[in-house]
């Protein structure tokens, strides 16, 4: 998504590393405010207080939370503690659990002195995967919408409108980034 002409994700790593930035969704729609999350506790608060919303974004945020936790304590106990802390923020959130389990599984065999770097890379990969999945969903959905428009004759002033119902939080703010086809 572009914010004032700048491509922006809903979560992104700080340039100097060691932190992530999020859009504080509690301030929308009246203000566009970003917040820097420097540690595991800040990430847990952001999830619990719903500064980030939407299943995919919550999962991505949790992945970066594990990475920040590994910067604090990369031991096996630190990994367990980071995962448990984040799981407690939204116990029923499916993507949160999935991301935490993916991080834990990926990091379990990594030596502790390499975990922070590996965790950061894995969290970034989870975010990139979310963008790719959303792009695939968008490509598929765009085809369906075009077919419906042709069927209804919308392009020639025929029946309309085409109604689209979303479930839960949908769109760019609920994900890391959204698919390109919706911007066409």
Curated annotation (Swiss-Prot):
Gene Ontology molecular function: any one: S-methyl-5-thioribose-1-phosphate isomerase activity
Domain of life: Bacteria
Name this protein carries in UniProt: Uncharacterized protein in petC 3'region
Phylogenetic classification of the source organism: Bacteria, Pseudomonadati, Pseudomonadota, Alphaproteobacteria, Rhodospirillales
UniProt record similarity statement: Belongs to the eIF-2B alpha/beta/delta subunits family.
Transmembrane segments: none
Biological-process GO terms, alphabetical: L-methionine salvage from methylthioadenosine
InterPro entries xref list: IF-2B-related (IPR000649), M1Pi_N (IPR027363), NagB/RpiA_transferase-like (IPR037171)
